[in-house]
Amino acid sequence: MAAHYLDFERPIADLESKIEELSRLSETAGPGAFDTEIQALRDRAQELRKEAYANLDAWQKTMVARHPQRPHLRDYVAGLIDEFVELRGDRKFADDQAIVGGLGRFRGQPVVVMGHEKGHDTTTRLKHNFGMARPEGYRKAVRLMDMAERFNLPVITFVDTAGAYPGLGAEERGQAEAIARSTERCLTLGVPMVATIVGEGGSGGAIALAGANRVLILEHSIYSVISPEGAASILWRDGARAKDAATQMRITAQDLIKLGIVDRIVEEPAGGAHSDTEAAIQAVGDAVEDELKAMAAMSPAELKKQRSDRFYAIGRAGLQ
């Protein structure tokens, strides 16, 4: 897949184009003909990448969180979960591929894993409905959480959605109830649960998989009650002011950790998770492993209390 550059990455894109051009010339001029020049350009591109990503504003982080080449649920499963067996369907209506989940081994430990899947191209994005789950997806999630508790397996979730699907059929089949039931099941689980926001964390559609003991977030991910575009349309009747809304909503990982909404920020490679997906996936794996080890000796009652205390604290802080 060809590299996709965001607006603020244009200077980097220009350098990468020059590197490709010199590499092609090097093939005809002979081995090593432009090695010095190519390396100098690569070093400069890396410097620009570090500078750009060290100073992103909230709107730029939103763009990074939505980057089409950012790793998604199936990438994390492929990189972290061995012997993965996907489980489909909610046993009531259908199988919603916006949420994918199943059983597997995470670094040797049996787990239940699930999350939103957006897809990487037109075909898979349509198949997964761009990560916007219908009621069947959340009911499937509840089914998997029930199974995890029955067999005493930790739950690992990956959150990446603009929000639950707002279509007429979804509403007719009880979208709000399905989201509420999934959120409730998260909060009442008697097994360890770790959620990681790996891209967008949009509204109730995200929190339905994020009511965990520990909520992690990638460095350039976002988590909010509504999209910046939606907030701008409501507040100012102007979706073009999404950048202003993103700043005021405090949706970045750095804001969220100060507010106590998330527990840990997972650093991304220079240039974002999409620039080195393998490194990003393993960094998430290391963080999840740390959190699961910290909860290994906790009883079901302790896990439930820790989880409820965590979310009650968020509510109390909001009232102060």
Curated annotation (Swiss-Prot):
Chemical reaction(s) catalysed: N(6)-carboxybiotinyl-L-lysyl-[protein] + acetyl-CoA = N(6)-biotinyl-L-lysyl-[protein] + malonyl-CoA
Enzyme Commission identifier(s): 2.1.3.15
Keyword Methyltransferase: no
Family matches, as Pfam families: ACCA
Swiss-Prot/TrEMBL GO biological process terms: fatty acid biosynthetic process; malonyl-CoA biosynthetic process
Keyword vocabulary terms for this entry: ATP-binding, Cytoplasm, Fatty acid biosynthesis, Fatty acid metabolism, Lipid biosynthesis, Lipid metabolism, Nucleotide-binding, Transferase
Chief location bin: cytoplasm
Subcellular localization: Cytoplasm
Ranges of residues in domain CoA carboxyltransferase C-terminal: 33-294
UniProt GO cellular component terms: acetyl-CoA carboxylase complex
Protein's pathway: Lipid metabolism; malonyl-CoA biosynthesis; malonyl-CoA from acetyl-CoA: step 1/1
Top EC class, one word: transferase
One GO MF term: acetyl-CoA carboxylase activity
Cystine connections: none
Domain of life, source organism: Bacteria
Keyword flag Hydrolase: no
Similarity remark: Belongs to the AccA family.
Function statement: Component of the acetyl coenzyme A carboxylase (ACC) complex. First, biotin carboxylase catalyzes the carboxylation of biotin on its carrier protein (BCCP) and then the CO(2) group is transferred by the carboxyltransferase to acetyl-CoA to form malonyl-CoA.
Protein name: Acetyl-coenzyme A carboxylase carboxyl transferase subunit alpha
Native source organism of the sequence: Caulobacter vibrioides (strain NA1000 / CB15N)
